[in-house]
Amino acid sequence: TKEEKIKLSRYMFGKAVGDEDVENARLQPALVGQSAYWIAKQAGFEIPEDTSIICVPCKEVGPKEPISREKLSPVLAVFKVKDDKEGFQKAAEMVEFNGLGHSAAIHCKEQAMADAYGEKVKAMRIIWNSPSTFGGIGNVYNSFLPSLTLGCGSYGRNSIGGNVSAV
């Protein structure tokens, strides 16, 4: 509901859409790595305990929409778009707002669509049909070098664009 979105946003970032000074919203570190159920409870609403992900409808990407920020939790911003072109644009905006050069994921059947997505989104790792969190760190789902340190290349002002490892 709208009320739950406001509660969630204020718990996670201290601000919600329309709040004064919303552009200065900051992620609450205590929620990192917590379950969806725990986060909802802290925010002040109930969801089933076995809920894996909280999906939150958003209208825009940027500082006025705190839920569009990086969340490091099982909370996803969801954008309704009319076609793949608009979807690619939203994905590009998310990467540019939250981590230029880092990673982006797409799930589709067509190689041409994945290629078009990769050309639009400024990310060093385009993860295709793999879980994005674990796909980005490599090894299990793809041939990326296993690492928890991921370079962002020149997009992110890094000297390294790949996964950094001692291997």
Indicate residue ranges for each PLM-predicted region:
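Conserved C-terminal structural/oligomerization subdomain of aldehyde/semialdehyde dehydrogenase
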Residues: 45-167
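ALDH superfamily catalytic-core signature
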Residues: 1-62, 83-89
